[in-house]
Amino acid sequence: MATGADVRDILELGGPEGDAASGTISKKDIINPDKKKSKKSSETLTFKRPEGMHREVYALLYSDKKDAPPLLPSDTGQGYRTVKAKLGSKKVRPWKWMPFTNPARKDGAMFFHWRRAAEEGKDYPFARFNKTVQVPVYSEQEYQLYLHDDAWTKAETDHLFDLSRRFDLRFVVIHDRYDHQQFKKRSVEDLKERYYHICAKLANVRAVPGTDLKIPVFDAGHERRRKEQLERLYNRTPEQVAEEEYLLQELRKIEARKKEREKRSQDLQKLITAADTTAEQRRTERKAPKKKLPQKKEAEKPAVPETAGIKFPDFKSAGVTLRSQRMKLPSSVGQKKIKALEQMLLELGVELSPTPTEELVHMFNELRSDLVLLYELKQACANCEYELQMLRHRHEALARAGVLGAPAAAAVGPTPASAEPTVSESGLGLDPTKDTIIDVVGAPLTPNSRKRRESASSSSSVKKAKKP
């Protein structure tokens, strides 16, 4: 059964503690349920955060007592939170002043330090860092049989191995401490070569048959060449550094031109292949009987690559579509190609939007695809002509300057105005010597075809004027 307190909670009413304890509801509570009685609560003063101060900074300044932050900096603890030390109630672990010895020292020196009483009798904790290099030891008989060298005496070899044990194979320190007065002056590479040669000999002699050997190898010649190259690199003059940077920049330019030439040759080859494929398919369609053409019209459509011609979308989805939508050019064709295509159609006397019958749509799309392919081939041919003309001018300039031994006409002769590069089924009919020049010399970026034709015509006219 619900009590008065439950009813008060449901109606969101508050009352005195006596009423809440007894569970009685007054008349005012039932008549005016919206009026809530304010609870007596301790009023706390709040301070507004100053403008421009971050919330995190203000939280650091705000103390637990809700006091206002100080206006002036002071040394008192008011306004800042102090970290209290958390002291446990456990018993403190005892520490003891005890002696210890370092195993790395051979003199047996005794030292003292504080350690926990529970660790009494244990080894020195830093003894695990006492790592030494195992330098091999050889006998007199082994030296005479396997390690004898005319350039090294036994006393000098013993001195080298003694320094190797003392300085843990730090050959720079060994070279500094080497007795150059008593023995011959040696370089760091000579010391390394002698040491590792003896280690390899001893490893081969003492090896057990059937075990894998880890023989240290040191190439002294390679190390000498490496240091010599580093010394030359360090001793370069500012002029040499600038020249090297210039050569690196030229190398990057040559590589970029080479990549661009390869890309253009690949695009040109794709265009030629597409032209050959389209011509072959046209011949096949002409040879086929007329009765079978309507049956194979859907299955044997000429497949023009995306890189050449126009790739029209296929409307194979369910639903009703207009046939004129098949003549719509895709978005991949640029505005420049569209304008050139419209100009060629007007020159041929073909309507830009003919009646969209089945046969007309198919033939109109094929015609526009062939026209775009022809436009791309003309552009590629113009690029090649422009590059060839630029290379011919550069070759003649070098020949006049005396850089090339052969005359300009011997390598690349002047071509007549009527000679034009023809496109055959195998490729472009270019001279092999011209291909060699194009592969070796990097051509600059080509401008528009109109500018190319103007520059070519102007250069030819200048040549004719110079001739006597």
From Swiss-Prot:
Keyword list, A-Z: Chromatin regulator, Coiled coil, Cytoplasm, Growth regulation, Isopeptide bond, Nucleus, Phosphoprotein, Repressor, Transcription, Transcription regulation, Ubl conjugation
Ranges of biased composition (kind: Basic and acidic residues): 1-11, 26-48, 258-267
Gene Ontology biological process: chromatin remodeling; DNA repair; negative regulation of transcription by RNA polymerase II; positive regulation of DNA-templated transcription; positive regulation of double-strand break repair via homologous recombination; positive regulation of protein import into nucleus; regulation of apoptotic process; regulation of cell cycle
Coiled coil feature spans: 225-275
The SANT domain, residue ranges: 149-199
Region (Disordered): 1-48, 258-305, 411-468
Location relative to the cell: Nucleus; Cytoplasm
Phosphoserine carried by residues: S449
One Gene Ontology MF term: transcription corepressor activity
Pfam families, A to Z: DMAP1, SANT_DAMP1_like
GO cellular component: cytoplasm; cytosol; NuA4 histone acetyltransferase complex; nucleoplasm; nucleosome; nucleus; replication fork
Main location: nucleus
Family matches, as CDD domains: SANT_DMAP1_like
InterPro entries for the chain: DAMP1_SANT-like, DMAP1, Swc4/Dmap1
Per UniProt, location of the Glycyl lysine isopeptide (Lys-Gly) (interchain with G-Cter in SUMO2) cross-link in this chain: K27, K214
TM spans (from-to): none
Phosphothreonine: modified positions: T446
Entry function: Involved in transcription repression and activation. Its interaction with HDAC2 may provide a mechanism for histone deacetylation in heterochromatin following replication of DNA at late firing origins. Can also repress transcription independently of histone deacetylase activity. May specifically potentiate DAXX-mediated repression of glucocorticoid receptor-dependent transcription. Component of the NuA4 histone acetyltransferase (HAT) complex which is involved in transcriptional activation of select genes principally by acetylation of nucleosomal histones H4 and H2A.
Quaternary structure, from the entry: Component of the NuA4 histone acetyltransferase complex which contains the catalytic subunit KAT5/TIP60 and the subunits EP400, TRRAP/PAF400, BRD8/SMAP, EPC1, DMAP1/DNMAP1, RUVBL1/TIP49, RUVBL2, ING3, actin, ACTL6A/BAF53A, MORF4L1/MRG15, MORF4L2/MRGX, MRGBP, YEATS4/GAS41, VPS72/YL1 and MEAF6. Component of a NuA4-related complex which contains EP400, TRRAP/PAF400, SRCAP, BRD8/SMAP, EPC1, DMAP1/DNMAP1, RUVBL1/TIP49, RUVBL2, actin, ACTL6A/BAF53A, VPS72 and YEATS4/GAS41. DMAP1 also forms a complex with DNMT1 and HDAC2.
Identification of the protein by name: DNA methyltransferase 1-associated protein 1
Lineage: Eukaryota, Metazoa, Chordata, Craniata, Vertebrata
